[in-house]
Amino acid sequence: MNELRCGCPDCHCKVDPERVFNHDGEAYCSQACAEQHPNGEPCPAPDCHCERSGKVGGRDITNNQLDEALEETFPASDPISP
């Protein structure tokens, strides 16, 4: 049987088949890794610091660009269907 590796970027942990965390079809070693460390939660493995690879609160898009993308996706003029 193939060894499962955690789907978290920069995580080098093996996934325990009896304690796997699934998210979007990928296997992760912990809930923190499955959620991509949204609040900087550490990886449970003492020698792994994959939580450092995530950009907590960072993004490469301005609020104005985000507003425009949202308006393009959900125009205010579209009627809401019941």
Curated annotation (Swiss-Prot):
Question: Where Cd(2+) 4 is bound, by residue?
Answer: 6, 11, 29, 33
Q: Which residues bind Cd(2+) 1?
A: 11, 13, 29, 43
Q: Where does Zn(2+) 1 bind?
A: 11, 43, 48, 50
Specify where the region named Disordered lies, as residue ranges. Answer: 61-82
Disulfide bonds listed in the record: none
Q: Which InterPro entries match?
A: Metalthion_dom_sf (IPR017854), Metalthion_fam14_prok (IPR000518)
Q: What is the effect of changing residue 23 to N?
A: No effect on metal ion binding capacity
Binding residues annotated for Cd(2+) 2, in chain numbering? 11, 43, 48, 50
What Gene Ontology molecular function terms does this protein carry?
cadmium ion binding; zinc ion binding
Q: Which residues bind Zn(2+) 2?
A: 8, 33, 37, 50
For this UniProt record, the keywords arranged alphabetically read as follows: Cadmium, Metal-binding, Metal-thiolate cluster, Zinc
Knockout phenotype, as recorded, reads: No effect on cell growth in the presence of excess Zn(2+)/Cd(2+) or in metal-limited conditions. Reduced long term survival.
UniProt: Cd(2+) 3 binding residues: 8, 33, 37, 50
Q: Which residues bind Zn(2+) 3?
A: 6, 11, 29, 33
This entry's comment on induction and repression of expression is: Up-regulated during the stationary phase.
Please report which protein family the annotation says this sequence is part of. Answer: Belongs to the metallothionein superfamily.
Q: What does this protein do?
A: Metallothioneins are small proteins that have a high content of cysteine residues which allow them to bind heavy metal ions through clusters of thiolate bonds. Preferentially, binds four Cd(2+) ions. Also binds three Zn(2+) ions but with less affinity. Required for long-term viability. May play a role in the storage or sequestration of metals when present in excess.
Q: What is this protein called?
A: Metallothionein
Q: Which organism is it from?
A: Pseudomonas fluorescens (strain Q2-87)
- Mind giving the lineage of the organism this protein is from? Bacteria, Pseudomonadati, Pseudomonadota, Gammaproteobacteria, Pseudomonadales
